[in-house]
Amino acid sequence: MFQILKADKLIDFMRWSKFAFVLSILMIGASIFTLSTKWLNWGLDFTGGTLIEVGFEQPADLEEIRTALEAKGFGDATVQNFGSARDVMVRLRPRDGVAGEALGNQILSAIKDGTGESVEMRRIEFVGPNVGDELTEAGGLAIIVSLICILIYVSVRFEWRLAAGAVLALAHDVIITLGVFSLMQIEVDLTIVAALLTVVGYSLNDTIVVFDRIRENFRKMRKGEPAEIMNSSITQTLSRTLITSGTTLFVVIALFTQGGAMIDGFATALLLGITVGTYSSIYVASALALKLGITKEHLMPPQVEKEGAEFDEMP
């Protein structure tokens, strides 16, 4: 199998665990501060609003359309291509006292006046604020339920100290990703929720691989110290982690650079989540389990007494 590191090389990861804890606490603190002051830039899926799709005869100039809408008082409109270069989607936040159909006609007139081109209305949709509130609750609930299920699974599959490390690592990844979204005011829609759930699953998969090797080495290296076994396990799985994360990031970077405005947020969430998740599987999940005092006794299979063993010991 292809290896980035030599099989006999041992990296002392736990030596830097205190520094990593401080770094993680600072990043989480900064993310919570940003979220508490700026919160998130919710998209129409959550706030409600109007979505209008129009068609041009020639490839549309998005900057010209934005300028035309801004001149008519629609400076908050989000303009992007949808499908082909001739199809344009305009998204607007709710406006008091203006019906969805009337707003669509105003947008269409503004685009025609500003660009001087023939424009056809393709579709108009209105998302009410009540639907947005329901989606917000459902999205948050989906992430919370997934973390609870992961806690139960890892506790049964491994041990509660490892489960605590895994769940806190996942929460760490989600909070930092949301913190960056809050800082940069990237619009959060349903695709971002999907990306966060993808990050949770991806990060967990990486953590489970490391945990499986930790459990195996605790049973094999009976005389080794816990920190030594952790270092050995992470080093042994590091090539797999780097290769998997690297190839995934190549695809995500392609989406980020070539995917267009429609999936910018999705690709950004994956890019951040996978990068932070690779770090957290080593320095949050594993290091936290070590701090909680995990030993080989916690991972050894229970001894089952054979029936009649007490009679075998009798003289």
Where are these regions (language model features)?
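A structural signal for conserved, well-ordered secondary-structure elements
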Residues: 1-315
